[in-house]
């Protein structure tokens, strides 16, 4: 498994349209799997808009 750092922005009703930035670090087999796990952990796409703008492998 590799470790990935994922940076994303999200906004929802409680942010009054303002984008908030967040990061997460995930162990996964691929970038795709890391993004999927991050979305699951943070509930991205359920009741918010989001943009994942950077995924980097941590060496």
PLM segments and residue spans:
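Short aromatic-glycine-(Arg/Gly/Cys) micro-motifs in beta-strand/loop hairpins
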Residues: 1-21
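Short, mixed-charge low-complexity intrinsically disordered segments
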Residues: 40-59
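Generic structural motif
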Residues: 9-13, 29-31, 58
